[in-house]
Curated annotation (Swiss-Prot):
Organism of this sequence: Hadronyche infensa (Fraser island funnel-web spider)
Purpose of the protein: This toxin potently and selectively inhibits ASIC1a (IC(50)=0.4 nM on rASIC1a and IC(50)=0.52 nM on hASIC1a), an isoform of the gene ASIC1. It incompletely inhibits ASIC1a activation in a pH-independent and slowly reversible manner (Tau(off)=14.2 minutes for rASIC1a and 31.8 minutes for hASIC1a). This toxin acts by binding to and stabilizing the closed state of the channel, thereby impeding the transition into a conducting state.
Entry protein name: Pi-hexatoxin-Hi1a
One annotated Gene Ontology cellular component of this protein: extracellular region
Family from the record: Belongs to the psalmotoxin-1 family. Double-knot toxin subfamily.
């Protein structure tokens, strides 16, 4: 079962948000996965669709082929 990405609904799947996200009930709306304040993706963590979530000094690096992008040191 794939994790739920940022801003997508997590109704009935509160524990399935991707790493660094939590299920949050918005006022007058349904529950969505939102970033946990102060959280960032560490080196070599997958960052597909989360380019801005890498920790300081890292950037989301698109690997060749069909491999997923990862947070890598800024060169």
């Amino acid at each position: 079962n794939e994790c739920i990405r940022k801003w997508l609904s997590c109704v009935d799947r509160k524990n399935d948000c991707c790493e660094g996200l939590e299920c949050y009930k918005r006022r007058h709306s349904f529950e969505v996965c939102v970033p946990i304040p102060g959280f960032c993706l560490v080196k070599w963590k997958q960052c597909d669709g989360r380019e801005r979530d890498c920790c300081a000094g890292l950037e989301c690096w698109k690997r060749s082929g069909n491999k997923s992008s990862v947070c890598a040191p800024i060169t």
